[in-house]
From Swiss-Prot:
This is Phosphoinositide-interacting protein. One of its GO terms (cellular component) is plasma membrane. Residues 8-19 have a biased composition (Basic and acidic residues). InterPro entries: PIRT.
Length: 135
């Protein structure tokens, strides 16, 4: 028959087991979860909510204007220059890239607004459920 090993002493534990933290309470699990905590009541500012689409739209608009400038310069200069051919290829590329980023930012804003409304409804129903169940 096999002999079962004795329980390991504290000093004999592997280094990986020393790194693990002991489980504490259910509330600590809620706090460490990836989702936003229901317990936080501080509302986010508009900048915190919309900063990513604003940055994408700003960069897209800058690239779009750069593409417009390059394209205009390419068609104003005479075709004798070798640089003109390169500018005529790069200009429309910047135009399309800038327009794409600008449109992505513009589409992102209504998506965030819809998500915020759903989150508000969800928080309302969670608080209502909490109120009704704890009577």
């Amino acid at each position: 028959m096999e002999v079962l090993p004795k329980a390991l002493e504290v000093d004999e534990r592997s280094p990986e087991s020393k790194d693990l933290l002991p489980s504490q309470t259910a509330s600590s699990l809620c706090i460490s979860s990836r989702s936003e905590s229901v317990w936080t009541t501080t509302p986010k500012s508009n900048w915190e909510i919309y900063h990513k689409p604003i940055i994408i739209m700003s960069v897209g608009a800058a690239i779009l204007l750069f593409g417009v400038a390059i394209t205009c310069v390419a068609y104003i200069l005479e075709e004798k220059h070798k640089v003109v051919q390169v500018l005529r290829m790069i200009g429309p590329a910047f135009l399309s890239l800038g327009l794409m980023m600008l449109v992505c930012g513009l589409v992102w804003v209504p998506i965030i607004k819809k998500k915020q409304k759903q989150r508000q409804k969800s928080n309302f129903f969670q608080s209502l459920k909490f109120f009704l169940l704890n009577r």
